[in-house]
Amino acid sequence: MRNYDLSPLLRQWIGFDKLANALQNSGESQSFPPYNIEKSDDNHYRITLALAGFRQEDLDIQLEGTRLTVKGTPEQPENEPKWLHQGLVMQPFSLSFTLAENMEVSGATFTNGLLYIDLTRNEPETIPPQRIAINERSALNS
């Protein structure tokens, strides 16, 4: 019998409350780049990516339907240094998140090597139930 760990997949879903709770309780390792997902209230979320060494022009954020994709392509140095120790990763990446319905990207900022993507859930206005009048109608004579 095989067991499959779905927590890495759940980490990519934002705006689903049950999955957000699973995210908070999941202690799984993260892939590059490391990121956090914060929930400030029921309608506001923030994704923070740690991108040391990247410049703003190296980054691209796209939203297609409910798929939010962040791509980074760092500029390659002319002369590759001879590393004694390389702890900072500077590699191209593409990271995608699936947003829940009614989630919108409200903004993105890049400060001190951290990319912040703010998300807002916009609940559609609920339309009150409509009462339908029942008219009296005489029976059809056949």
Curated annotation (Swiss-Prot):
SUPFAM superfamilies: HSP20-like chaperones (SSF49764). Residues 26-137 form the sHSP domain. It holds the Pfam family HSP20. One of its GO terms (cellular component) is cytoplasm. Its main location: cytoplasm. One of its GO terms (biological process) is protein stabilization. InterPro entries: A-crystallin/Hsp20_dom (IPR002068), ACD_IbpA/B (IPR037913), HSP20-like_chaperone (IPR008978), HSP20_IbpB (IPR022848). The keyword Cytoplasm applies. It is found in: Cytoplasm. Keywords: Chaperone, Cytoplasm, Stress response. Homodimer. Forms homomultimers of about 100-150 subunits at optimal growth temperatures. Conformation changes to oligomers at high temperatures or high ionic concentrations. The decrease in size of the multimers is accompanied by an increase in chaperone activity. Associates with aggregated proteins, together with IbpA, to stabilize and protect them from irreversible denaturation and extensive proteolysis during heat shock and oxidative stress. Aggregated proteins bound to the IbpAB complex are more efficiently refolded and reactivated by the ATP-dependent chaperone systems ClpB and DnaK/DnaJ/GrpE. Its activity is ATP-independent. Belongs to the small heat shock protein (HSP20) family. HAMAP family: HSP20_IbpB. The N- and C-terminal flexible termini are involved in oligomerization and in the binding of non-native substrate proteins, and are essential for chaperone activity. This is Small heat shock protein IbpB. It comes from Salmonella typhi.
